[in-house]
């Protein structure tokens, strides 16, 4: 019995504890990133943004959370109640489940599986079901139109994201996210005789794919300028029109969790993960989780600036960009990268 406990029960308890700790840290990070998003947008518009709740408005997101929890959920009369309430739960659960395989530093991962990137791609592809369920169950035309737009948009840009990931996998030769980060210790910089640095990361050697992945990530997470599913001027709020209180909060949490996931994946695939910008002794003292967080915040800042500066695309422009520009470009890059790797015999 004791052997059974230490062999099976204890590892399971450790994994549950790690998952709960990751969940708490992730929710706190999302709360402050949401505040940062609002602050950036306010600064661009020459406003102050949230500045009342707590010093510099730091507790605004927590006040909003409390407000949503204390509100009574209202279910439309013609809605399918079970599906209506299940939809936000599906959306937020799938969004949070992807973080199980994200390595925030060397060894800082809940489940270090060999097919981590495939797991993330599979789970994130299912997130559209939560949006479709919410749009259909609301029994209203605006949510349904928003859900249909979201399904078409996410499916269109998943193709480009998948091909971008294939180019990275060709260079690394592994589906393990930790291996993808460690492979970026050598690259174009070390080939030129320079010490390991940011010049070795994939953002330089795969720069077109870096741009495609970033823009496709915006479309995949319904962020401006690709926020067609919840366009306020057209569909009021898209699939979330009929939602309020806790279900609305869960949809928003799932949306921002997906945005943070794109920041994490961009950091891992193209920005060296937890690796320092230059491999020197005083930068190696900085914990890897700090480098990872700084790079992720930089990507999130770029996403926030895009929201503030770039106007919304029309639906036909969105589809044309995905199918007529990104898809051929991604396919061409897969062929070019494979040809170069075969010709040179180099990977890394």
UniProtKB/Swiss-Prot annotation:
GO cellular component, one term: plasma membrane
Entry keyword set: Cell inner membrane, Cell membrane, Membrane, NAD, Quinone, Translocase, Transmembrane, Transmembrane helix, Ubiquinone
UniProt record, GO biological process: aerobic respiration
Originating species: Agrobacterium fabrum (strain C58 / ATCC 33970) (Agrobacterium tumefaciens (strain C58))
Membrane topology: Multi-pass membrane protein
Cited Pfam families: NADHdh (PF00146)
UniProt-recorded name of the protein: NADH-quinone oxidoreductase subunit H
EC number: 7.1.1.-
Cross-referenced InterPro entries: NADH_UbQ_OxRdtase_su1/FPO, NADH_UbQ_OxRdtase_su1_CS
Lineage: Bacteria, Pseudomonadati, Pseudomonadota, Alphaproteobacteria, Hyphomicrobiales
Molecular function GO labels: NADH dehydrogenase activity; oxidoreductase activity, acting on NAD(P)H, quinone or similar compound as acceptor; quinone binding
Its biological purpose: NDH-1 shuttles electrons from NADH, via FMN and iron-sulfur (Fe-S) centers, to quinones in the respiratory chain. The immediate electron acceptor for the enzyme in this species is believed to be ubiquinone. Couples the redox reaction to proton translocation (for every two electrons transferred, four hydrogen ions are translocated across the cytoplasmic membrane), and thus conserves the redox energy in a proton gradient. This subunit may bind ubiquinone.
């Amino acid at each position: 019995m004791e052997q059974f406990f230490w062999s099976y029960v204890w590892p399971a308890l450790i994994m549950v504890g790690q998952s709960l700790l990751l969940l708490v840290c992730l929710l706190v990070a999302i709360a402050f990133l949401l505040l940062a998003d609002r602050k950036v947008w306010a600064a661009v518009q020459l406003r102050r943004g949230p500045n009342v709740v707590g010093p510099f408005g730091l507790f605004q997101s927590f006040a909003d959370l409390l407000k949503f929890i204390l509100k009574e959920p209202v279910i439309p009369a013609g809605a399918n109640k079970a599906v209506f309430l299940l939809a936000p739960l599906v959306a937020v659960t799938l969004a949070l489940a992807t973080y199980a395989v994200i390595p925030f530093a060397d060894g800082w991962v809940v489940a270090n599986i060999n097919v981590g990137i495939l797991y993330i791609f599979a789970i994130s592809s299912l997130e559209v079901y939560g949006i479709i369920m919410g749009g259909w169950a609301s029994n209203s035309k605006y949510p349904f139109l928003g859900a249909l737009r979201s399904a078409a948009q996410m499916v269109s840009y998943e193709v480009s994201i998948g091909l971008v990931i294939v180019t990275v996998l060709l260079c690394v030769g592994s589906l393990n996210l930790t291996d993808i980060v460690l492979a970026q210790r050598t690259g174009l910089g070390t080939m030129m005789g320079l010490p390991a640095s940011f010049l070795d990361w994939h953002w330089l050697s795969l720069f077109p794919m870096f741009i495609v992945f970033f823009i496709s990530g915006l479309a995949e997470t319904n962020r401006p300028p690709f926020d067609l599913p919840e366009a306020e001027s057209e569909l009021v709020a898209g699939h979330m029109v009929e939602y309020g209180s806790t279900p609305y909060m869960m949809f928003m949490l799932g949306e921002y969790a997906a945005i943070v996931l794109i920041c994490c994946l961009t950091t891992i695939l193209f920005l060296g993960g937890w690796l320092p910008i230059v491999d020197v002794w005083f930068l190696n003292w900085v914990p890897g989780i700090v480098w990872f967080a700084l790079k992720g915040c930089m990507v999130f800042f770029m996403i926030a600036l895009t929201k503030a500066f770039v106007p919304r695309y029309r639906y036909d422009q969105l589809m044309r960009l995905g199918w007529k520009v990104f898809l051929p470009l991604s396919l061409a890059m897969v062929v070019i990268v494979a040809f170069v790797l075969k010709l040179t015999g180099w990977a890394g």
